[in-house]
Design a protein with these regions (language model features):
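Glycine- (often His-adjacent) and acidic-residue-rich active-site loop
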Residues: 83-118, 135, 165
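C-terminal long alpha-helix characteristic of the crotonase
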Residues: 150-155, 197, 206-252, 258-264, ...
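Acidic, divalent-metal-coordinating active-site segment for phosphoryl/phosphodiester hydrolysis
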Residues: 192-199
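Short helix- or helix-capping micro-motifs
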Residues: 92-93, 176, 184-190
Length: 284
């Protein structure tokens, strides 16, 4: 029956809906690892870098291009960040690319990402993360920088960087405790263990948890609601709600990340991950 409905164009890509959300990127964005789509006053940034939507320098550049395009538009009120891969949201940073950069390169990368995420947080544009499955490491940090996080029931969140001998570099040591409290954030960051969508909701990391097949409709419903709000009021609510020492905390995280990233343990953790073996950390 499903094959027949797809053949008839009543389900699947031809129908415009499919069994899971399907990106319809604007011209010029078809080959980008992050694709831009617009629906009325809503922009959608589709993470589309197979196989795992891993965050590489190219993905960071693409996210920045999307944000510059969206924030420069007078019509866009909401940005939804979603995955074009139905099996995951974002598995984290591209570990292989880490082997090609030194401590200075790592610092430049974190500067770029933090600059982007802080721009998102300071903007009058509301941001929504539609987390359909795995959101680990940088993927979790990207979601945390959004104003609203809608999670599918099968989603999971985690900060596994410590298993590589490094620390979260995109805000995980700062935004996570602000969202779920210091004790739970320390547990996640020190163990690297993921949590379920339901736990994320109970902790305060996810605003809503919905059945997988309702995720996209729910995210769009939130987006349409937020797009009707006054942009100046949105910006000031976001600004006042985030008042505090987040910038100082992020600066401390950036310095700590660069220091740890250049360590022998970090090289061992990354190498062990790529070689699919357990790391042997020596405290150096």
């Amino acid at each position: 029956i499903l094959r027949r409905l797809v053949a008839q164009g009543r389900l699947g890509v031809k129908s415009g809906q499919g069994f899971y959300p399907h990106a319809h990127p604007e011209a010029g964005w078809e080959d980008s690892p992050v694709k831009l789509e617009r629906i009325d006053r809503i922009a959608i940034a589709w993470l589309d870098r197979p196989p795992a939507n891993s965050i590489s320098p190219e993905v960071v550049d693409a996210l920045r291009r999307v944000w510059d395009e969206v924030s420069g538009s007078e019509n866009i009120r909401v940005l939804v960040i979603a995955s074009a891969n139905p099996m995951l949201f974002c598995a984290g940073a591209d570990i292989k690319s880490f082997t090609k950069i030194d401590a200075d390169g790592g610092r430049r990368l974190t500067d770029q990402v933090h600059g982007l995420l802080r721009d998102m947080e300071r903007s009058s544009i509301a941001t929504i993360a539609a987390v359909n499955a795995i959101a680990f490491g940088g993927g979790c940090e990207l979601a945390m920088a959004c104003d609203i996080r809608i999670a599918a029931q099968s989603a999971s969140f985690g900060q596994p960087e410590i298993n590589l001998g490094i620390i979260p570099g995109f805000g995980g040591t700062q935004r996570l405790p602000r969202l779920i409290g210091e004790a739970r954030a320390l547990e996640m960051n020190l163990t690297g263990d993921p949590i379920s969508a339901q736990a994320a909701y109970e902790y305060g990391l996810a605003n809503r948890v919905v059945p997988d097949h309702e995720l996209w409709d729910t995210a769009l419903a939130w987006a349409h609601k937020l797009s009707d709000q006054a942009p100046r009021a949105v910006k000031q609510i976001k600004r006042v709600s985030a008042a505090g020492d987040l910038d100082a905390g992020i600066e401390a995280e950036k310095q700590a990340f660069a220091k740890v990233f250049g360590s022998e343990d970090a090289r061992e953790g990354i190498t062990a991950f790529l070689q699919k073996r357990n790391p042997s950390f020596r405290g150096k």
